């Protein structure tokens, strides 16, 4: 039986909030089988819970933000969510003492190290997957994202920025998902932004924690980070990272073929909602026999970094 996963022990880290620029403490705790992924705002009294749910994503302007019926929010969840998807963690309590998850270095890599440091433990309950059964597509102008059936998790993402530092040879990335592939090919890709946009946003009191330490920054001609890129196609890899995190808002690893063109948090969420709203388009599956599991999900719990 392919089993559910949680952490072996709790672990804590501090970082900076991307939007507030303030110190944020993040605590990750083990959870019982079938708990799912649950975010908590511990700075509020009483504590407010945000179970991972695509319908709770109500702001996708600059990040993926969960907002409850009372308007309480928790922002920038997508990179941590991507790390959970990458390692196949089903059940976890995520506590944060601020309205946002710390940005760390702008990638999912620090969260991977944190989760592996806590240790991953299999639980005595069958792991559920969402299997795509029918073709589903959403569009927004020339942007689009789609799912179709596939026995694995395959991703194909294309960006299109008219910028001299983003050549046509670094605008597409394709990958067959596995824990190892995510850790080595995707998790280290950092978020990015354009200097003119960042200056405007900071004048509006946003992205106050943004810097060259936690983002790739481009002016009109070049990349401003002294150390350059971690991959020549780091930007499109980060967009794939975002998509993996956004799609894991379902709370389950997905078996299907995902393809997107110029998609962002909003369209990723729209696709996930469209899939889940059509009961003919998907089903829950579990696997008693490891031989039946799609190759990308057979990986051992421990991942070598």
UniProtKB/Swiss-Prot annotation:
Record keyword Lipid biosynthesis present: yes
Residues that hold Zn(2+) according to the record: 79, 238, 242
Listed pathway(s): Glycolipid biosynthesis; lipid IV(A) biosynthesis; lipid IV(A) from (3R)-3-hydroxytetradecanoyl-[acyl-carrier-protein] and UDP-N-acetyl-alpha-D-glucosamine: step 2/6
UniProt KW keywords: Hydrolase, Lipid A biosynthesis, Lipid biosynthesis, Lipid metabolism, Metal-binding, Zinc
GO BP annotation list: lipid A biosynthetic process
InterPro entries: Ribosomal_Su5_D2-typ_SF, UDP-acyl_GlcNac_deAcase, UDP-acyl_GlcNac_deAcase_C, UDP-acyl_N-AcGlcN_deAcase_N
Residues at the active site: 265 (proton donor)
Enzyme class: hydrolase
MF terms (GO), sorted A to Z: metal ion binding; UDP-3-O-acyl-N-acetylglucosamine deacetylase activity
Lipid metabolism listed as a keyword: yes
Cellular compartments per GO CC: membrane
Cofactor dependence: Zn(2+)
Catalyzed reactions: a UDP-3-O-[(3R)-3-hydroxyacyl]-N-acetyl-alpha-D-glucosamine + H2O = a UDP-3-O-[(3R)-3-hydroxyacyl]-alpha-D-glucosamine + acetate
Cross-referenced HAMAP family: LpxC
Its job: Catalyzes the hydrolysis of UDP-3-O-myristoyl-N-acetylglucosamine to form UDP-3-O-myristoylglucosamine and acetate, the committed step in lipid A biosynthesis.
Protein name (record): UDP-3-O-acyl-N-acetylglucosamine deacetylase
